[in-house]
UniProtKB/Swiss-Prot annotation:
GO terms of biological process kind: RNA repair; tRNA 3'-terminal CCA addition
Gene Ontology MF terms: ATP binding; CCA tRNA nucleotidyltransferase activity; magnesium ion binding; tRNA binding
Iron listed as a keyword: no
Family designation: Belongs to the tRNA nucleotidyltransferase/poly(A) polymerase family. Bacterial CCA-adding enzyme type 3 subfamily.
Protein's name according to its UniProt entry: CCA-adding enzyme
Annotated binding of Mg(2+), by residue: D45, D47
Binding site for ATP: G32, R35, R116, D159, R162, R165, R168
Length: 402
């Protein structure tokens, strides 16, 4: 198969391929970028594979950086662009079900493509737009099938993260997982316990944000892979509820909203504890916890200015989005109205600070100072006090007298 045209992302990198070929070596575009152009999807990273060994690649180009030379990757800096060039390679027995014990550089494109995970990721594209398809990936693209390259059991035993990648690709591409490949996923699902939590989180997070995330979640459940992910063991009913509770066309706006929705469906009591098991950042934990908190507040009462001030409009709208997806009453207009009525959105917007209170009223630093500023803040938020120095100082004097 030959492409009628090369997208601009490939066009920019063509001089790199031609330079390598001029030096007497083979060079191809490989990986997900080739798959995406065949599916008419946006292209992100353009990867180049070559028969030249790393030291040979470095001799071809003037400016290079060793970004992963032990794995055959050299970063080439050329005409304002950066290109990762990786030598064809084979891999020895994997350790920890993730990393090869040894990488061997080879001159054969076929040997290199054999080690890829799925047939639709095992294409190569030459400078003339010809697609090299050694594993019937084009047929799988046409049939919307995700199939492992070679023996599926070997691929997942080599690198168990491929199980999560497969589920994620199913969710992003709307592909069914080929039967033998799926059975191998189920067989090797327990190996996910050997994979770093951070890597599993990245793949699961991408799955949740994918346009066909429901397909990916169903495959996650059917494969029993969830049993080997943090905090999800034996939670099939809750994961199924996660799907059934949301409108079938609902797409998550953010990672934070997706994980908040999952946590709500699983009836997790302590959000931060749950997310710490996934080794997420404290900032992420805080935002997810706030979305969950707002959702639970909304189960008890309507929104107030104080809620808007404390959590912020972005967090509250995401919680309201989950309510809408669950078929509950929502009021986005009220959120906008309350937000517009707030005199301040942050404590730093108060015209008086601790220094002013020390200078004008002689209040000493300490717990009392913090309490006074909190009272000022609340009164302004509730509309009981205008954000002007004279009014605030009068308020403080009255507060101290009471």
């Amino acid at each position: 198969m030959r492409l009628n045209y090369l997208p601009s992302e490939f066009q920019k990198a063509l001089p790199i391929l031609k330079k390598i070929k001029k030096a007497g070596y083979e060079a191809y575009f490989v990986g997900g970028s080739v798959r995406d152009v065949l599916l008419d999807r946006p292209i992100h990273d353009v990867d180049i594979a070559t028969s030249s060994y790393p030291e040979e690649t470095k001799q071809i180009f003037k400016r290079t950086v060793d970004v992963g030379i032990e794995h055959g990757t050299v970063l080439v800096l050329e005409k304002g662009g950066e290109y990762e060039i990786t030598t064809f390679r084979t891999e020895e027995v994997y350790v920890d079900y993730r990393r090869p014990s040894q990488v061997n550089f080879v001159r054969s494109l076929e040997e290199d493509l054999k080690r890829r995970d799925f047939t639709v990721n095992a294409f190569a594209l030459n400078e003339d737009g010809e697609v090299i398809d050694l594993f019937h990936g084009l047929d799988d693209l046409d049939n919307h099938l995700l199939r492992a390259v070679g023996l599926a059991s070997e691929r997942f035993n080599e690198d168990a993260l491929r199980i999560m990648r497969g589920l994620r690709f199913s969710a992003s591409l709307n592909f069914d997982i080929e039967t033998t490949t799926f059975e191998a996923m189920k067989k090797h699902a327990s190996l996910l316990e050997k994979i770093s939590v951070e890597r599993s989180f990245i793949e699961f997070d991408k799955l949740l944000l994918a346009p066909y995330w429901r397909k990916g979640m169903l495959a996650l459940i059917d494969s029993h892979a969830f049993n080997y992910l943090p905090c999800l063991k034996n939670r099939e009913l809750q994961l199924s509820a996660f799907l059934s509770q949301l409108d079938k066309d609902f797409l998550f706006e953010t990672s934070e909203q997706a994980w908040a929705s999952l946590i709500l469906s699983m009836e997790v009591e302590h959000t931060k504890t749950f997310l710490k098991k996934w080794k997420t950042s404290t900032h992420f934990q805080k935002d997810v916890e706030h979305i969950v908190d707002v959702y639970r507040i909304r189960e008890q009462m309507g929104l107030t200015k104080e809620h808007l001030y404390r959590y912020g409009k972005t967090i509250i709208k995401q919680a309201e989005g989950i309510r809408k997806a669950r078929g509950l009453m929502v009021d986005f207009e009220k959120i906008e109205q309350l937000d517009s009525e707030l005199a301040i959105h942050d404590r730093h917007e108060i015209v008086v600070n601790g220094g002013t209170l020390i200078k004008k009223l002689g209040i000493k630093p300490g717990p009392q100072m913090g309490d006074i500023i909190s009272q000022i803040e609340l009164a302004i938020v509730l509309g009981q006090l205008i954000n002007e120095e004279e009014a605030i100082l009068h308020f403080v004097k009255q507060y101290l007298m009471d």
